[in-house]
Curated annotation (Swiss-Prot):
GO cellular component: cytosolic large ribosomal subunit
Gene giving rise to this polypeptide: rplL
GO molecular function term, any single one: mRNA binding
Function: Forms part of the ribosomal stalk which helps the ribosome interact with GTP-bound translation factors. Is thus essential for accurate translation.
Descriptive protein name: Large ribosomal subunit protein bL12
Ranges in a coiled coil: none
Keyword presence, Iron-sulfur: no
Protein family according to the UniProt entry: Belongs to the bacterial ribosomal protein bL12 family.
Superkingdom of this protein's organism: Bacteria
Amino acid sequence: MSITKDQILEAFAAMSVMDVVELIEAMEEKFGVSAAAATVAVGGDAGAAAEEQTEFDVVMTSHGDNKVAVIKAVRGATGLGLKEAKTMAESSPIAIKEGVSKEEAEALKKDLEAAGAVVEIK
């Protein structure tokens, strides 16, 4: 009688964490493999996922020399009041907008840099 994948998964689900760790160690010894190799492969996939980033954060690292123009640009981009925009501009580095599209992030960066700010897109 052979064991199906579903039966193996059910057995894993019923095991404690320590039992799973011991099983993995036994499998490493029996088959001459290492679980660390799987971690490296996952790390490679994470790099590919990072290339497909769809949401970006616009971070102002410095307001530069023309603080008044930067405050106006921050107000226009965020819709904040004068006091809040001034506080934000003076609190750099600070995220001006988070989770925006690449196009919106680049447009905001262009506007803030035109006002004299130093901006990064993350």
